[in-house]
């Protein structure tokens, strides 16, 4: 099937092969060991414990479905703005070909504030997880639509062995069953179908009955207004990953505060 996700995964495999030739595992391990870690899960739980929305604020220049979201794109400034206006964590796109992201953007955003940072990319190999640790990420994303269950479990175990938090992302009930076999407390429900890029926030609401109370539900994509936030919080969904709404605003941090606080 030649859909968007399959094309992205094919490119990832080519990128991994090239990266492994230029930066062998042992070199990456040395870089990773020199990096400190910030508590991604703890930051989300702290916001929730205080009765606030736990916002993972995204640093994203573009997307395949929407094109360029922000022309004036300075990751350090965006990160500082998010931190000043109540974000719990950051998410930074590192995919170059499809999202115009960069490893450098993650490094710049993390250096500009004290928030924990998620590497937002399409991870299909353990090498990318070590790469994430070496670049300074505190958490990684695993996308159920791109992985079978045994591989997802192996990748999670490797991430945890490096001290990284794992956000597992699903879009339907079958993927949620797959995700619930993992140990991570972070369950992301993507309201956007990665194969068609169609979006509905009802996707999150329709899966809440499957989720044990000890897990943290993170609703992702399509959260564009205070009304969307209120709808989710009324359903006891209190963690959010938001990018587009902030990136399109003149002041991303101020838009975060307007929508959530």
From Swiss-Prot:
The organism's place on the tree of life at top rank: Bacteria
UniProt pathway: Amino-acid biosynthesis; L-tryptophan biosynthesis; L-tryptophan from chorismate: step 4/5
Record-linked PROSITE patterns: IGPS (PS00614)
Catalytic activity: 1-(2-carboxyphenylamino)-1-deoxy-D-ribulose 5-phosphate + H(+) = (1S,2R)-1-C-(indol-3-yl)glycerol 3-phosphate + CO2 + H2O
Enzyme Commission code: 4.1.1.48
An annotated GO BP: L-tryptophan biosynthetic process
GO molecular function: indole-3-glycerol-phosphate synthase activity; phosphoribosylanthranilate isomerase activity
Keyword hit for Cytoplasm: no
Bridged cysteine pairs (disulfide): none
The UniProt record lists the keyword Amino-acid biosynthesis: yes
UniProt KW keywords: Amino-acid biosynthesis, Aromatic amino acid biosynthesis, Decarboxylase, Lyase, Tryptophan biosynthesis
Pfam families for this protein: IGPS
Family: Belongs to the TrpC family.
HAMAP family assigned: IGPS_B
Protein name (database record): Indole-3-glycerol phosphate synthase
Organism per entry: Burkholderia ambifaria (strain ATCC BAA-244 / DSM 16087 / CCUG 44356 / LMG 19182 / AMMD) (Burkholderia cepacia (strain AMMD))
High-level lineage: Bacteria, Pseudomonadati, Pseudomonadota, Betaproteobacteria, Burkholderiales
């Amino acid at each position: 099937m030649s859909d968007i996700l399959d094309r992205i995964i094919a490119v990832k495999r080519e990128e991994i092969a090239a990266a492994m030739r230029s930066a062998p595992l042992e070199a990456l391990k040395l870089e990773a060991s020199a990096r400190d870690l910030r508590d991604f899960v703890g930051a989300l739980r702290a916001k929730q414990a205080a009765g606030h929305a736990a916002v993972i604020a995204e640093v994203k220049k573009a997307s395949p479905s929407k094109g360029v979201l922000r022309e004036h794109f300075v990751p350090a400034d965006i990160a500082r703005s998010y931190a000043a206006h109540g974000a719990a964590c950051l998410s930074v796109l590192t995919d170059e070909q499809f999202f115009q992201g960069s490893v450098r953007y993650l490094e710049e955003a993390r250096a500009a504030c004290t928030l924990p940072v998620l590497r937002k990319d399409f991870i299909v190999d353990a090498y990318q997880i070590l790469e994430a640790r070496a670049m300074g990420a505190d958490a990684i994303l695993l996308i159920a639509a791109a992985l079978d269950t045994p591989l997802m479990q192996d990748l999670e175990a490797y991430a945890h062995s490096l001290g990284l938090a794992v956000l597992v992302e699903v879009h339907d009930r079958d993927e949620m069953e797959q995700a619930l076999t993992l140990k991570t407390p972070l369950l992301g429900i993507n309201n956007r179908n990665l194969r068609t890029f169609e979006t509905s926030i009802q996707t999150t609401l329709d899966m809440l009955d499957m989720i044990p109370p000890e897990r943290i539900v993170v609703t992702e994509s399509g959260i564009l207004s205070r009304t969307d936030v209120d709808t989710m919080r009324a359903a006891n969904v209190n963690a959010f990953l938001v990018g587009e709404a902030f990136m399109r605003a003149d002041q991303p941090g101020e838009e975060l505060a307007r929508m959530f606080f």
